[in-house]
Amino acid sequence: LDWCRDNGVKVHGHVLVWHSQTPEAFFHEGYATHKPLCSRETMLARMESYIQQVLTWTNENYPGLIVSWDVVNEAVADGSDQLRESNWTKTVGQDFVNRAFEYARKYAADGVKLYYNDYNTPLDPKLHGICVLLDSLIADGTIDGYGFQAHYSVGSPTIDRVDWAFQQIAKRDLLLRVSELDVGIDDTSEENLQKQAKYYGNLMKIFLRYADRIEAVQVWGTVDDLSWRADEYPLLFDKDAQPKPAFDTLVELAQ
């Protein structure tokens, strides 16, 4: 954050509430895992306190630097239109996402945008579940945008399916972010590199159609060998930091 402040780089915050990155002890009485899970009231108080502390501290120490936040990450279950079972649903219940956004809106500085972020957006029935959740947050007046994680592979999901998902989210008049973009391939043969470039290009054509709504397209890494999917060569630069055909394709489309 110091570097961003000193170099005039605005920041998107990730993430306030995420089931998989919240310590188990946070959900238990006395913060001790051998004790029972907390009551709804206790967990709501802990959630509010945590969100308040993070947002207040960042705003006081880095005023105006963090311009948006992912409030909740990956709450909808794969292969379902329901929230995934987690310690948040076990303690707070099915409205934990709504409560997180309520608290984030309460403590965020004026003008800070609040996002829900998830993956596998193009896949039904998950897309339906995401839309239902977004509609409830829109009704609450607490959400500004949706973050599309886009951890794809060439041909999967199809471009048409990605386009359809964008249509469903965009018609809800939310801001959009492509929050985690990478595209896997089996190997770095010239044929596969060209397929990767074409798929990246087709994705970017979709993104450009919503350019008035998309705040950012964030590639999930820089060079292939440092990617979390290193064995799938998913990024725009190879292990030697040389641009791949996908990079050239995106540059051409951006001009």
What are these regions (language model features)?
Residues D81-Q82, L123-A139, T158-F166:
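Distinct, well-ordered alpha-helical segments
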Residues N120-L123, Y152-V154:
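Short histidine/acidic/glycine/proline-rich micro-motifs that form metal-
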Residues L1-Y115, Y119-T121, L174, V183-I185:
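Substrate-binding cleft and catalytic face of glycoside hydrolase catalytic domains
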